[in-house]
Design a protein with these regions (language model features):
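Disulfide-rich extracellular domains of secreted proteins
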Residues: 1-146
């Protein structure tokens, strides 16, 4: 049976904010079951490896190494124009930027396009097997202007 680990709390927020500029509990802008491009989070206008980390809701071990998929949407403001690179990571046991836990998998997007793009990466069997605690998973996003 499919499981979905959606954001449940902000763990680290370095210069990230909601689409309206507020900075309290921004995870609730990205926790929907169906993507809503009218509410989102954003990095600083000129990001310098600014990190955002959210804890995912509790999942149970599916007892298989297949069909572990991380899905998200990303884009940039056309007005900003500069090259922005984005790294999306799945981590286990993240505590802080000084103690990032175990990197399970990641994907780098170079020169993010304007507008919204669906992002996804599927864990390999070895990456899925590296997860030992499905209740302690995080998504870490970093944005960097080149």
């Amino acid at each position: 049976m499919p499981q979905f680990g959606r954001p449940t709390t902000d763990t680290t927020r370095e210069a990230w904010e909601e689409d309206d500029g507020t900075t309290v509990d921004i995870w609730d802008q990205i926790d929907e079951a169906v993507a809503d491009d009218l509410d989102f989070i954003r990095s600083a206008q000129v990001p310098t490896t600014d990190a955002y980390v959210t804890k995912l809701g509790t999942l149970t071990d599916p007892l298989q190494s297949t069909s572990h998929v991380v899905r998200y949407r990303y884009g940039k403001d056309t007005a900003a124009g500069a090259q922005i690179n984005l790294v999306v990571e799945l981590r286990q046991a993240y505590v802080s930027e000084a103690s990032q836990g175990t990197l399970i998998a990641s994907l780098t997007h170079t020169d993010v396009a304007s507008g919204w793009t669906a992002g996804t990466f599927t864990l390999s069997g070895a990456e899925a097997d590296a997860i030992t605690d499905y209740t302690n998973l995080y998504v870490r996003i970093t944005a960097n202007q080149i």
